[in-house]
Design a protein with these regions (language model features):
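N-terminal juxtamembrane cytosolic/stromal segments of multi-pass membrane proteins
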Residues: 1-31
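Membrane-embedded alpha-helical transmembrane segments of multi-pass integral membrane proteins
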Residues: 40, 44-47, 70-74, 136-139, ...
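Helix-coil boundary and interhelical linker segments in multi-pass alpha-helical membrane proteins
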Residues: 49-60, 113-126, 169-179
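Structural signature of hydrophobic alpha-helical transmembrane segments
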Residues: 61-70, 120-134, 183-187
Length: 208
């Protein structure tokens, strides 16, 4: 009986160590990734809004393509360098998080390719706005759950709530993305990426 109690205690300690190791491994790196994607997405989105207001030329919407091109390039370089430097085995939780964000990235990429293959269907690109508001929120919420950070969970949920507003517009048959909806997307990037990034880095510095 005593042996069972010790086993349970060791199991709890192991789980706690794994969670703490995951937080230590992911906090700074993941925080920087959140910030890179968040500031890049928000800056490009604001640039598109300004140019559309100034010129009324919809071709400036192509600036949005800078986000995935620059974002995935920087992320790929950082991941490659991190793998070369790190000799610590990844935890199950960190692998799970990486897989979640990999799936989200794959969905974005697959939808973008589909839009390019049906280039003449302009309305299909509106779906990128919906994905850009919903999926980061889901990924951020999942990150918060795995890291047991309620503040990050709340940021993810708020992002999803903002995204559901755009989903309602699509269901009601709205065909054109408005400047206000673009502004909502900027707000979504701030809530789901920038704020969680600063939270993760702040928590990491406190643990050092």
């Amino acid at each position: 009986m005593e042996e069972k109690k010790i086993s349970e205690q060791e199991s709890l300690e192991l789980i706690t160590r794994m969670i703490n190791q995951t937080k230590k491994d992911l906090s700074v790196g993941n925080g920087d990734s959140f910030l890179m994607w968040g500031y890049l997405s928000a800056a490009i989105s604001l640039a598109v809004i300004v140019m559309l207001l100034a010129t009324n030329d919809p071709r400036y919407a192509w600036l949005y393509m800078v986000i995935p091109i620059a974002g995935f390039t920087v992320s790929g370089i950082k991941t490659y360098k991190a793998k070369r430097k790190s000799h610590v085995a990844s935890t199950y939780a960190s692998n799970t998080l990486n897989n979640v964000w990999a799936i989200i990235s794959a969905v974005f990429a697959a939808y973008a390719i589909s839009c390019l293959l049906h280039f003449g269907e302009v309305r299909s690109w509106n779906g990128m706005f919906l994905l850009g508001m919903l999926l980061p929120g889901i990924g951020t919420y999942t990150t918060g759950v795995i890291l047991k950070e309620k503040s990050i969970q709340m940021c993810g949920l708020l992002g999803v709530v903002i995204g559901t507003g755009l989903l309602r517009d699509f269901v009601c048959g709205e065909q054109v993305i408005s400047i206000m909806q673009m502004g909502h997307m900027v707000l979504s990037f701030v809530i789901t990426l920038i704020i969680p990034g600063h939270i993760l880095n702040f928590k990491a510095k406190k643990q050092q």
